[in-house]
């Protein structure tokens, strides 16, 4: 007789559509989305990897403190850097242009800090991981830089570019997790969830059974 598997509700501590879509790829649907609004300013001399894991931890803790029910909270933060220099999350076309110039013809690194908290009976169990992917862009012409910086896709993206968009045409080399570049390393996410007791099951509301027959609505953002 098969054991009925009941997973805890999964809360995504991010309003990122990309992270929702990435979870969809591995057939996981967050029960709820609660964006964690925190100060993401790097500390003095803070390096990219420690920054990413610190921000992921702060996001997870903030959301965990806001909920009362037993849940699994997934939080992540992605940081792009050239050497030790952290590139901003571009908010203007000029920032996009600055970032693209910085990575043109150079290897750069994308770090995603992952923090997953299992909150059960007011006890917190943590899983944390920092994942690094190395990317190299070809040497871009002024025309390519100007064209890309005129697009919307780099706005609000770490490092001023969207790897799954037009910027993919610039990539000559990738070493590491592709999903990490997009904001959530899926291999590490599933491993962490599994270690906290999550299981795939046809009885589980957090998992798609059959996309062709189950039309499940996307979670709402709180």
From Swiss-Prot:
It comes from the Bacteria. It catalyses: a ribonucleoside 5'-triphosphate + H2O = a ribonucleoside 5'-phosphate + diphosphate + H(+); a 2'-deoxyribonucleoside 5'-triphosphate + H2O = a 2'-deoxyribonucleoside 5'-phosphate + diphosphate + H(+). Its main location: cytoplasm. One of its GO terms (biological process) is nucleotide metabolic process. Keywords: Cytoplasm, Hydrolase, Nucleotide metabolism. Its cofactor is a divalent metal cation. The active site is at residue 77. Signal peptide: none annotated. One of its GO terms (molecular function) is nucleoside triphosphate diphosphatase activity. InterPro entries: ITPase-like_fam, Maf-like. Its EC number is 3.6.1.9. It is found in: Cytoplasm. One of its GO terms (cellular component) is cytoplasm. Nucleoside triphosphate pyrophosphatase. May have a dual role in cell division arrest and in preventing the incorporation of modified nucleotides into cellular nucleic acids. Belongs to the Maf family. This is Nucleoside triphosphate pyrophosphatase.
């Amino acid at each position: 007789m098969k054991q009925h598997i009941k997973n805890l509700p999964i809360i995504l501590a991010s309003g990122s559509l990309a992270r929702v879509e990435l979870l969809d790829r591995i057939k996981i649907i967050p029960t709820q989305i609660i964006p964690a609004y925190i100060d993401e300013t790097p500390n003095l001399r803070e390096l990219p990897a420690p920054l990413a894991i610190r921000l992921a931890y702060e996001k997870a803790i903030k959301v965990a403190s806001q909920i009362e029910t037993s849940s699994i909270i997934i939080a992540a933060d992605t940081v792009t850097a050239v050497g030790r220099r952290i590139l901003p999350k571009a908010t203007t076309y000029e920032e996009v242009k600055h970032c693209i110039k910085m990575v043109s013809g150079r290897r750069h690194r994308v770090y995603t800090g992952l923090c997953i908290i299992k909150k059960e009976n007011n006890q917190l169990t943590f899983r944390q991981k920092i994942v690094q992917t190395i990317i190299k862009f070809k040497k871009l012409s002024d025309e390519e830089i100007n064209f890309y910086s005129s697009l919307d896709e780099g706005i609000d993206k770490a490092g001023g570019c969207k790897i799954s968009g037009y910027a993919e045409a610039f990539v000559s080399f990738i070493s590491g997790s592709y999903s990490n570049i997009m904001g959530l390393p899926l291999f590490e996410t599933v491993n962490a969830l599994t270690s906290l007791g999550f299981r795939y099951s046809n009885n589980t509301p957090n998992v798609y059974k059959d996309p062709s027959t189950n039309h499940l609505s996307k979670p709402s953002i709180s």
